[in-house]
A protein has these predicted regions:
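Transmembrane helix recognition focused on a "late"/terminal membrane span
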Residues: 166, 182, 199, 237-239
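Alpha-helical hydrophobic membrane-insertion segments
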Residues: 32-35, 39-43, 67, 167, ...
Length: 240
């Protein structure tokens, strides 16, 4: 029986099942996504020998592709046929997507600077802004308002998924690393066997699974809010 207490398990379980059922569609999309986002940014970084030169590409190209991947997972979670073109649909709302990406990054970064806890809370509260902007075609402000609205009362259910994602990112570092100071971060590669193994597992299994789980959670919370609003609208007016 579905209860508020086991929603986290339901989302993770449904996400895993959807990942396995659609793995033939998901893995090529994940590969294409990383080729389009990570590879060019890395080449720019290597060419200029400075991480900061890759920031414009990551913001104006990789960010819309990331939002498009959210739509890709949302459509799979809804039982629709996976379309690789979804990955590029973030460019159809370019300004809103860039705005949401920048504001969300600033909110989370600011929260983590305030002793981490606010960053986690704000990350959960506003995380679905990156879904609403492409799924519901909302503006920047409305995307954050909508995310806060549908996550109200469910932050504790999303907390475990968020912490699981953070743990995976910490325990499975990337092959591409940075050396040097903040002003001049240099490109370095870590090709130790355990690093490569953990990177492959993270990139092609764990993170796509959590992406599917978050898409399932988003759909469920949207449905809950729509049901709640429909019930309120259908209540009889008892005022005299």
């Amino acid at each position: 029986m579905e209860t508020e207490e086991n929603l986290t398990y339901i989302w993770l379980n449904e996400g895993w099942d959807s990942y396995l059922d659609n793995i033939r569609h998901i893995l090529p999309a994940v590969v294409a996504f990383h080729i389009l986002t990570t590879l060019p940014a890395t080449l720019i970084w290597k060419y200029f020998d400075n991480r900061w030169y890759a920031i414009p590409y990551e913001l104006f190209i990789a960010a819309p592709l990331t939002i498009g991947m959210n739509l890709f997972f949302i459509n799979i979670a809804r039982g629709r046929i996976a379309e690789y073109g979804d990955i590029f649909k973030g460019f159809s709302m370019f300004l809103n997507v860039i705005g949401v990406s920048i504001v969300f990054g600033l909110i989370v970064a600011g929260g983590f600077l305030m002793f981490i806890v606010p960053g986690v809370i704000w990350g959960i509260m506003y995380g679905f802004a990156q879904y609403a902007v492409i799924d519901r075609k909302t503006g920047v402000k409305d995307s954050f308002s909508y995310s806060a609205m549908i996550t109200y009362g469910y932050k504790h259910n999303l907390l475990f998924i968020f912490l699981l994602w953070m743990t995976i990112e910490i325990l499975a570092p990337g092959v591409i690393t940075s050396t040097g100071g903040l002003r001049h971060p240099n490109l370095a590669l870590d090709v130790k066997p355990w690093v490569i193994t953990s990177f492959v597992l993270k990139t092609f299994i764990f993170l796509p699974w959590l992406d599917m789980a978050m898409a399932k959670a988003y759909i469920r919370l949207v449905k809950n809010k729509e049901t709640e609003q429909s019930t309120e609208n259908n209540e009889p007016d008892l005022s005299l």
